[in-house]
Structures are given as structure tokens and as C-alpha cells.
Design a protein with these regions (language model features):
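Polytopic transmembrane helical bundles with strong interfacial aromatic enrichment
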Residues: 1-178
Length: 178
């Protein structure tokens, strides 16, 4: 699994390097009126910076033998990267297909829902890394306990992580269809 994660990270990094090079090229040549959307260039460069930081955190995570703080930072930077890339995709699609979006008004409820969803995902990441840390502490204190028993030794807040995960799923489905 670790090798697969590294390979995936390298593929994402290379893809973002290509994205950034194309964004700089399109900005310089004003391809498809690209200069009128400087946020795309800024977001592309920002995604390159964030993927480098995420990669360095991933390497540190391996070297630190899954340190909880590094793991949490790595996950949060990965979430930020996905958010930036999502913005780039949406903004690019709107730029290329401007006629489809002419006259379309911003939906403030959808915007607030997406921000709320993002905050819930951050809480989910923090809960998940906290549970993992507590599991590691239980396994150090009780090395002979089977994995299932170690999980049972955790406080009831472990269920909040699962409950929030299902809540995120259903909230995402709800947002998609409304």
C-alpha cells in the first residue's frame, strides 16, 4: 500500500506540474482569453506549492513512522489540494463554456452548504487521526489485546467518526440532488 501511495503522489505531482506549465503558457499567450481569469494561473501555481508541501509531509510521515501531527497536516493539505483542483476544474469549465453559464446566478445556499461540507470533512480528518492515535496508545499499553478488543477499549467518541462519515455521504447526496 505504501508503494502505491507514493506512486499515486508522484502521478499527482507530475500532473500538477503539467497543469502549472500549461497555465503559465496560456496566460502568456492569452489562449482562449486566459488573461481575463488570473485566478486560474494563481490557483495552478498554488496547487503546485501545496502538492510539494503535501509530498514533503508524506515523506516526513513515512520517516516519522506515522506521527499523528504529521499525518493530520498531510491529510489537511491533501484536502486543500483537492479543493484547489476542484476550483480550477469548475472555473476552467465555466471559462470554456461561458455561453452555458450566461445569466446563471450564484446560489448562496449551495455555497454555504459546500463550505459546511468542507468544515465537516476537516472535523472528520481530525477525529480520524485522533482515533488512530488513541488506538496506537492502547496497543502500546496492551500489546496482547486483539485488534477488535483494542477498538472496544476506545471511548464512545469513536462512533462519532463513523456517524459523521455517513452524515457526510448523505449530505453530499442531498446537495447533489437539490
Amino acid at each position: 500500500i505504501e508503494y502505491g501511495n507514493r506512486l499515486f503522489g508522484v502521478l499527482v505531482g507530475i500532473s500538477i506540474i503539467v497543469l502549472t506549465v500549461l497555465a503559465i503558457y496560456y496566460y502568456k499567450t492569452n489562449y482562449n482569453n486566459f488573461r481575463s481569469h488570473p485566478s486560474l494561473l494563481f490557483s495552478s501555481v498554488l496547487s503546485l506549492i501545496v502538492v510539494i508541501i503535501t509530498g514533503l509531509l508524506g515523506a516526513e510521515l513515512v520517516w516519522s513512522v506515522l506521527d499523528t501531527f504529521i499525518k493530520t497536516l498531510h491529510m489537511l493539505f491533501a484536502l486543500a489540494l483537492v479543493s484547489i483542483l476542484s476550483y480550477i476544474c469548475i472555473k476552467s469549465y465555466k471559462m470554456i463554456n461561458a455561453k452555458l453559464f450566461r445569466g446563471l446566478k450564484k446560489n448562496p445556499i449551495l455555497s454555504k452548504s459546500l463550505i459546511f461540507l468542507w468544515v465537516l470533512i476537516v472535523i472528520e480528518i481530525l477525529l480520524g487521526t485522533g482515533i488512530r492515535t488513541n488506538l496506537e496508545l492502547v496497543s502500546i499499553e496492551n500489546p496482547s489485546l486483539p485488534k477488535g478488543e483494542q477498538l472496544n477499549a476506545l471511548s464512545p467518541y469513536k462512533y462519532l467518526h463513523s456517524l459523521l462519515g455517513f452524515g457526510l455521504l448523505f449530505f453530499s447526496i442531498y446537495i447533489n440532488y437539490h
